[in-house]
C-alpha cells in the first residue's frame, strides 16, 4: 500500500498497479486514496487496498475460495507448495528446456502471466522483487498465475533491473529469492519468443510513455489538495 514510499511520491505502488491492470492478464489490487484521521488527529494520505487472500482470488477469478492455492515468496507458505516445488525441480532437471519439457511447464503454469509479471517488475525496477504472490484454482485449468504485489520501492535509476531479476545468485532484498524459474524458462527458445512478443506489446501499450505520463498526472492530481497539509 505504498508504506515505503510514504515520504516520497506516495503513489509508486498504485501507479504500477493501475498500469499493469491494463495488461488484462496480471492480477493486482484495486486501490483508493483516502485521508486518515485517528481520534481526530490528521494522519495524512493513505491507500485502501484489496487484501490478497483466497477471497481476493475468488472474487477476481470467479472461482470458489476452497479451490484456490495461494503461495507466498518461494512457495514456502500455502497449500500446493509441494507441486510448485516439483515444477521448479523439473525445470532445473530439464534445462535447457526442449519443446516437450516446455509443453510440460506450460501445462502447469500460465507462462504469459509470468512473462507479463517479469516485464512489469523490470519496467518499474522493483527492488523488493522477492515479495511474490501467485496462485492457481482447481476450478479452472489449475495453472499457476502471478499477482502484482508490493511495488513501492521502485523507479530508481542506476541499477540493471533486468539482471537483478535473472541473477543466478538470487533476486530481491539480500538476493534471498531463487531465480531458478525465470533462468530455466529463458533456456527455452519458445519462451524467449513469447517474452519478446509480450515485451513489445507492453512497451507499445501498457507502458507507452504518453500513457504513463498521463497516469502520473491523474494520480498526482488526486493527491495535490492534501500535499500542503
Please place each PLM-identified region on the residue numbering:
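Middle-to-C-terminal accessory/interaction subdomains
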Residues: 5, 26, 33-37, 42-46, ...
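Fold-level signature of zinc-dependent metallopeptidase catalytic domains
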Residues: 1-10
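Acidic, His- and aromatic-enriched active-site or binding-groove loops in soluble protein domains
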Residues: 48-73
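Zn2+-dependent metallopeptidase catalytic core
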Residues: 11-25
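Short, charged N-terminal helix-start/capping segments
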Residues: 30, 36, 51, 63-65, ...
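Trp/Tyr-centric glycan-recognition "aromatic platform" motifs on solvent-exposed beta-strand/loop surfaces
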Residues: 1-2, 18, 128
Amino acid at each position: 500500500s505504498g508504506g515505503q514510499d510514504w515520504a516520497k511520491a506516495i503513489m509508486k505502488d498504485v501507479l504500477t498497479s493501475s498500469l499493469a491492470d491494463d495488461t488484462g492478464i496480471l492480477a493486482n489490487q484495486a486501490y483508493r486514496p483516502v485521508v486518515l484521521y485517528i481520534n481526530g488527529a490528521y494522519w495524512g494520505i493513505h491507500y485502501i487496498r484489496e487484501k490478497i487472500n483466497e477471497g481476493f482470488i475468488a472474487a477476481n477469478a470467479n472461482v470458489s475460495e476452497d479451490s484456490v492455492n495461494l503461495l507466498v515468496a518461494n512457495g514456502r507458505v500455502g497449500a500446493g507448495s509441494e507441486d510448485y516445488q516439483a515444477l521448479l525441480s523439473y525445470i532445473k532437471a530439464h534445462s535447457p528446456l526442449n519443446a516437450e519439457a516446455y509443453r510440460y511447464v506450460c501445462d502447469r503454469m500460465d507462462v504469459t502471466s509470468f512473462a507479463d509479471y517479469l516485464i512489469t517488475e523490470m519496467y518499474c525496477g522493483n527492488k523488493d522483487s522477492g515479495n511474490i504472490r501467485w496462485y492457481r484454482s482447481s476450478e479452472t485449468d489449475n495453472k499457476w498465475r502471478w499477482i502484482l504485489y508490493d511495488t513501492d520501492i521502485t523507479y530508481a535509476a542506476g541499477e540493471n533491473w533486468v539482471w537483478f531479476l535473472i541473477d543466478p545468485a538470487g533476486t530481491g532484498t539480500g538476493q534471498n529469492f531463487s531465480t531458478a524459474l525465470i533462468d530455466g524458462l529463458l533456456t527455452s527458445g519458445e519462451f524467449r519468443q513469447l517474452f519478446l512478443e509480450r515485451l513489445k506489446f507492453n512497451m507499445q501499450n501498457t507502458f507507452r510513455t504518453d500513457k504513463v505520463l498521463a497516469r502520473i498526472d491523474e494520480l498526482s492530481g488526486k493527491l495535490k489538495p492534501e500535499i500542503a497539509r
